[in-house]
A protein has these predicted regions:
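Amphipathic alpha-helical dimerization/coiled-coil segments
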Residues: 50-98
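Amphipathic alpha-helical coiled-coil segments and their boundaries
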Residues: 79, 86, 112-115, 119, ...
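Basic helix-turn-helix/winged-helix DNA-binding cores
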Residues: 1-62
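Non-transmembrane amphipathic alpha-helical segments
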Residues: 86, 93-104, 126, 133
Length: 164
């Protein structure tokens, strides 16, 4: 479930209520503050959640993040521009991996590993992405990965002439 905006959180709650997957546990009232509703998962909701977890854990699916799409169109940028953007991504990835690692180190003696698996996974995935982006950036920097309009036109011409 992708919940990115406040409105979609309320829509998600309404749908879960409508479908009987959650129910209202209580409504808390404080003077001068809006009512706060506390929800709890229903037995049906728990069964659906457990089945979803089993499915997602056991079956790799093709997800569609934006980064691979941008990579497929990187030739629309100049190598210089692409390198600049990839270096910005490296900075963000380095900081994020370091932050996750710091959190893992800080809490490993306090929190059982079971509850840190998500962070471990995120760190591993981001570290792999960081390694790839560094490699591609270095290849652009040293000229072993290069393109320009003339080269792209030549490639397009060769590929289309082979199709005919």
């Amino acid at each position: 479930m992708n919940v990115r905006q406040r409105a979609s959180i309320y829509q998600t709650i309404e749908r879960l209520l409508r479908d009987g997957q959650i129910s209202v546990k209580e409504t808390l009232r404080e003077t001068g503050k809006p009512d706060r509703t506390v929800y709890e998962i229903t037995n049906e909701g728990r069964e659906i959640l457990i089945e979803w977890i089993r499915e997602v854990l056991s079956t790799p699916i093709q997800e569609f993040p934006n980064f691979p799409v941008a990579i497929s169109y990187i030739s629309l940028l100049s190598p210089h521009d692409a390198l600049e953007k990839l270096e910005q991504r490296i900075d963000v990835l380095e900081k994020t991996v370091q932050q996750i690692d710091n959190n893992l180190q800080t809490y490993k003696s306090l929190i059982p590993r079971l509850f840190m698996l998500e962070s471990e996974y995120q760190k591993t995935v981001l570290a792999a992405e960081l390694e790839w982006v560094r490699s591609a950036s270095e290849d652009i920097r040293n000229g072993s990965l290069f393109w320009n309009d003339e080269w792209l036109s030549d490639i397009a011409e060769r590929l289309t002439s082979k199709e005919e």
